[in-house]
Amino acid sequence: MATQKSVDELKKAHALLAELDYEKRPVERGYANRTLYINLSDNTIETKPVTEQMKTLFTGGRGFGLWLLYQAIDDETKWNDPQNEIVIANGPICGIVSYPGSGKSTVVTVSPLTKSIIDSNAGGYFAPYLKFSGFDALEIQGKAEEDVIIVIDGDEGKVTVETAPLEDLDSHLIGPQLTEMYAIDERDKRGVSVVST
């Protein structure tokens, strides 16, 4: 676990590459009604609306992930092309504690192994926190020139892309580092979720 001094050093080494302030709004009938798009090649961040067509035909989760990926790629897109996306999406019952498994997110991308579109799911807190932050899906496209982190602060209504030059590269180490870095205090650590590749 990182010490407070080392966390301060890590944060001090960050440079802000992109920032988006957004209006927080409530989830309606299971939908936040927008997605978050981040392009790491040109450091752009924007929100996109969730249309009635998306909700009717694709519901959420895997459907949203596939829809968003299909809109971004073409038949020639390879797994390591900047055009490929990693899409993390949640469904309309995500975050409802009455249903087991409602904390799942679906990840959709072009696979390096099969060279075809794949989806996988993961549990944890990220999907509900993404929903409660105001987004039904997160699209990450492009290739960063250096190691970066994406911070979605649902309490403040802010998304940032920051350089991360000193952080550990191993997922089991960077998770606790980032939790320590972005939690306000010990109690707030429960409100931080880290996804890493």
What are these regions (language model features)?
Residues M1-T197:
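N-terminal export/ancillary region detector
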